[in-house]
Each structure stands twice: as structure tokens, then as C-alpha cells.
A protein has these predicted regions:
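Internal intein/HINT superfamily modules and their associated LAGLIDADG
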Residues: 1-117
């Protein structure tokens, strides 16, 4: 099976290169919204582009080098329920540490109350 059509391939990329975390977003000075986020940043644009194409979701952002000898990097990012959907698909391929982190985010999302604190 081709890597570009294989869930295990992309789960491996996220396991090794990705970040999973909760992001806060303050709105109207009264509420703090909390969202699960999946992010993967690297200099290989083709890999970042293939993540977006495979999962059919997310945004790609370009980052210019901060120093002359650095390369341009690209970040693919998904948040909210779509991030949870991806975690649920990929969790069986993750390492133990990543499974634990994914389960924390999934539980948070499941137990949220309109996602507002």
C-alpha cells in the first residue's frame, strides 16, 4: 500500500513530528474557549500538503526563516472536533506517550460543556 494512501503512514508522521495540545482563546473578556489542536510543522512542504490532502481538513501556514541559514517551514493545523476525529482515527498507531496525550484531549472534548470556561 502506498504511504500517501495509508493511515498508518500519516499517524506515524503525527506521532513523530506532530503536537497535540489544548489551546485557549479568550472572547468578549468574559469567556475562555478551549480547543484541542493538532499541529505539524516541518520544512518539507510536500509532506505538510499531503497531510491536508489525506485528512481533507486543516490550514497550512508558511513561516519565513528567522535566521539566514534556516529554511522556510510549513505548519498544518487542525482544531476542535475535526482534530478529535483525526486523533480517534490515528490513536491505534501512536506510541504509548502519544496515546496518553490523545486520550486526554479526547476526554476533555467529550466532557466539555459548550467548550467554555
Amino acid at each position: 500500500m502506498s504511504g500517501l494512501n495509508n493511515l498508518g503512514y500519516f499517524a506515524g508522521i503525527l506521532d513523530g513530528e506532530g503536537s497535540f495540545f489544548l489551546e485557549t482563546n479568550k472572547k468578549e473578556k468574559r469567556y475562555i474557549y478551549i480547543y484541542p489542536v493538532i499541529s505539524c510543522e516541518m520544512t518539507d512542504f510536500d509532506v505538510i500538503q499531503s497531510l491536508k490532502k489525506f485528512f481533507k481538513v486543516g490550514h497550512i501556514t508558511k513561516f519565513e526563516p528567522r535566521k539566514k541559514h534556516y529554511k522556510i517551514s510549513w505548519r498544518w493545523r487542525v482544531r476542535g472536533g475535526k482534530a478529535i476525529d483525526i486523533l480517534k482515527l490515528c490513536i491505534k498507531y501512536f506510541s504509548i506517550r502519544r496515546k496518553e496525550k490523545a486520550n486526554i484531549l479526547i476526554e476533555h472534548w467529550k466532557n466539555r460543556r459548550d467548550n467554555v470556561v
